[in-house]
Amino acid sequence: MNQEELEKCIDAAQNSQQYAHCPYSHFRIGAALLTSCGKIFTGVNVENSSYGLTICAERTAYTKAVSEGYKSFKGIVVASDLKDRFITPCGACRQFGVEFGDFEVVCVKPDRSTFKSSTHKLLPGLFSQEDLIAKAEQDERECKAQN
């Protein structure tokens, strides 16, 4: 993301926090996902009394984008209200993000200070489509060897 895109995404992520549904944790998270063609999709965390049904802000943004046909991303910005530390995506959101490639992940505090990383750096040893392709190719080779 260039600086102008980053600033727009920070604005969008921080502004979206007001819509978070977090009656249990009171921990508002906003996300802004930038597509390769410059469109921004926002997301917020949506909690549920059955905690396992809660969805994070990042996955909300990803599903909004994908449901409208976007699958190529430049970056995602994740905003929280914590002043003393950066909040990074949870493990599920990290795995969800790498499905769409290696792109920038920016975590932002209320004062707009940032921590920058990438989907691949945040999930070392990641499991991806390449692993599934490698397994299919291995199975095909083994099948041919048996015939």
Curated annotation (Swiss-Prot):
Substrate binds at N45, V46, E47, N48, S49, S50, Y51. Disulfide bonds: none annotated. Keywords: Hydrolase, Metal-binding, Zinc. GO terms for biological process: cytidine catabolic process; cytidine deamination; deoxycytidine catabolic process; pyrimidine-containing compound salvage. GO terms for molecular function: cytidine deaminase activity; zinc ion binding. Residues 4-130 form the CMP/dCMP-type deaminase domain. It comes from the Eukaryota. Its EC number is 3.5.4.5. Gene3D superfamilies: Cytidine Deaminase, domain 2. The keyword Cytoplasm does not apply. Pfam families: dCMP_cyt_deam_1. It catalyses: cytidine + H2O + H(+) = uridine + NH4(+); 2'-deoxycytidine + H2O + H(+) = 2'-deoxyuridine + NH4(+). SUPFAM superfamilies: Cytidine deaminase-like (SSF53927). Coiled coil: none annotated. Zn(2+) binds at C56, C90, C93. Its cofactor is Zn(2+). InterPro entries: CMP_dCMP_dom (IPR002125), Cyt/Deoxycyt_deaminase (IPR050202), Cyt_deam_tetra (IPR006262), Cytidine_deaminase-like (IPR016193). GO terms for cellular component: cytoplasm; cytosol; nucleus. The active site is at E58 (proton donor). PANTHER family: CYTIDINE DEAMINASE (PTHR11644:SF2). This enzyme scavenges exogenous and endogenous cytidine and 2'-deoxycytidine for UMP synthesis. Belongs to the cytidine and deoxycytidylate deaminase family. This is Probable cytidine deaminase. It comes from Dictyostelium discoideum (Social amoeba). The gene is cda.
